[in-house]
């Protein structure tokens, strides 16, 4: 067999007792038989996959801090998670990790523009575009001038219109996911991109709920029979009319749960109500 190796960057986001929690990209652990984590002082520790999120291309790796001296542990800083909702156009940012495509590289620049209410899988969020170089697979993390993590470069939102700019996922949209990953829990996966039916659309005759822009192929919703154009009106016993309500209900579920989902589907001349059972998976 041919042995292959790769190098990826990560950031230490928490210390829990003797365990260090490192955020990195899913590509960093993809098909890995073993993981080594090199600290800034050159110390190399064995890493273990805590959990991954293939939808958001994130992974958490843990390291055993008990093998370090007290001095080393004291000098190992945890990066603070910032508030990406406060990021605005023109803000100065620093990229660390692998912005040049190799680890230990850095870059700096500005936030060129902010896109709000971007349709994410199972939610909505903010995406920043920046002049900073960014290698998504190798791991590029953006920090503000207070030294706080505000996001990471992703390939999920790159397109021809913003060619030459790096797309950045804001950390605040993923804090609940990071908490799950850090605790070894797979975040719940429903598998849609959706948007709220507006008041004007309801007044025009559409049912209130979440309009399914995309039922992600081979996702739980797709496999249950939910289609593009369906309007989700309830999950379990709770009505959902906003993406926040949808996310709140999804957060109550775990991988393996089976939940009843009520949908309005547009027919030739009217909407009809359908019931589906969706089996939640881990992301």
Regions found by a protein language model. Name each.
Residues 2-25, 44-46, 80, 106, ...:
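A conserved glycine-rich beta-strand in the N-terminal activation segment of trypsin-fold
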């Amino acid at each position: 067999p041919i042995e292959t190796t790769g190098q990826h960057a990560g950031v230490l986001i928490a210390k829990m007792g003797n365990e260090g929690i490192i955020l990195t990209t899913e590509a960093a652990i993809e098909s890995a038989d073993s993981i080594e984590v090199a600290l800034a002082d050159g110390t190399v520790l064995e890493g273990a996959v805590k959990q991954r999120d293939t939808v958001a291309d994130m992974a958490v790796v843990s390291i055993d801090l008990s093998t370090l001296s007290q001095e080393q542990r004291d000098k190992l800083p945890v990066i603070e998670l910032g508030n990406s909702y406060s990021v605005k156009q023109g803000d100065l940012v620093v990229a660390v990790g692998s912005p040049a495509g190799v680890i230990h590289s850095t870059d700096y620049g500005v936030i060129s523009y902010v896109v709000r209410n971007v349709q994410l899988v199972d939610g909505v969020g903010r995406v920043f575009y920046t002049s900073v170089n960014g290698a998504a697979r190798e791991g590029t993390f953006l920090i503000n001038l207070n030294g706080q993590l505000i996001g990471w470069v992703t390939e999920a939102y790159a397109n021809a219109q913003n060619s030459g700019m790096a797309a950045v996922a804001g950390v605040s949209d993923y804090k609940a996911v990071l908490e799950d990953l850090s605790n070894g829990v797979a975040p719940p996966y429903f598998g849609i991109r959706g948007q709220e039916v507006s008041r004007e659309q309801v007044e025009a005759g559409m049912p209130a709920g979440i309009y399914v822009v995309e039922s992600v192929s081979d996702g739980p919703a797709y496999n249950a029979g939910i289609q593009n154009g369906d309007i989700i009106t309830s999950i379990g016993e709770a009505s959902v009319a906003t993406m926040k309500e949808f996310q709140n209900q999804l957060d109550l579920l775990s991988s393996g749960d089976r939940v009843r989902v009520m949908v309005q589907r547009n027919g030739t001349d009217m909407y009809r109500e359908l019931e589906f059972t969706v089996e939640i998976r881990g992301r």
